[in-house]
Design a protein with these regions (language model features):
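N-terminal juxtadomain amphipathic helix
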Residues: 1-78
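Conserved SAM-binding loop and adjacent beta-strand
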Residues: 75-89
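Helix N-cap and loop-to-helix transition residues
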Residues: 32-33, 79, 151, 173
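Short, conserved clusters of charged catalytic residues that mark active-site
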Residues: 1, 88, 176
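Conserved SAM-binding loop
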Residues: 91-189
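Short, structured secondary-structure boundary patches
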Residues: 37, 80-82, 148
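Generic detection of long, well-ordered alpha-helical segments
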Residues: 3, 43, 47, 79, ...
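Charged/polar, solvent-exposed surface patches and flexible loops
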Residues: 16, 70, 84, 88, ...
Length: 189
């Protein structure tokens, strides 16, 4: 099915600009054999550019498929270069938004590496929300994780920063998701 509206703003002026045929539907999944790898289901991808808001998305995204699977592994914390990059981003956010000793929520925190980096630098507390979080991955008493999708109730958690890094590409109804976050925060900005 070709999605004809931008999932971020609803605009219908979409230009397809890049196509990949027969791409595996899972990325970052570890498998035990060549046969298992070759058996991964495949779909076509067509990237579309929204002329209204600039959002780029897969116009052929199949909303009936659960794109998360056992064996999902996105760990990059073993790379010194990547961790230096995360440290620079973390320090910049903490300085720019005066987050020393503050609470930070990361929606779509994955394994919690970025949130852990933020909290190690700012000395505050971190709350991660992600259905794919693996319990026990982080060993920091200043971190708390909710292994679930972001819900309206999460907006009641007091925090000075809510961030969402490498998450929107996993959510097809982007506008609805962002509106949920906005609505859940009430009068807070």
């Amino acid at each position: 099915m070709l999605h004809k509206k931008c999932p971020s703003c609803g605009n219908e002026r979409i230009d397809g600009f890049f196509t990949i045929n027969n791409a595996p539907i899972f990325s970052l999944v570890t498998v035990k054999s060549k046969e298992e790898a070759l058996a991964v289901p495949r779909k076509n991808i067509e990237l579309g550019f929204c002329n209204h808001c600039g959002f780029i998305f897969n116009r052929l995204f199949d909303t009936s498929i659960d794109y998360f699977s056992a064996g999902y592994e996105d760990q990059q914390a073993f790379s010194r270069t990547f961790m230096e990059y995360l440290k620079r981003i973390s320090e910049g956010l903490i300085e720019k938004y005066d987050l020393k000793d503050k609470t930070i929520i990361e929606i779509g925190c994955g394994k919690g590496d970025f949130l852990n980096q933020l909290v190690q630098i700012n000395g505050g507390k971190g709350i991660g929300i992600d259905p794919a979080y693996e319990v026990g991955r982080q060993n920091n008493p200043n971190l708390k994780f909710y292994k679930q999708f972001y819900a309206f109730e999460h907006g009641k958690i007091p925090a000075e920063l809510i961030c969402c890094r490498h998450t929107l590409e996993h959510i097809h109804q982007t506008e609805e998701f962002l509106q949920l976050i906005r609505d859940s925060l009430g009068e807070r900005t």
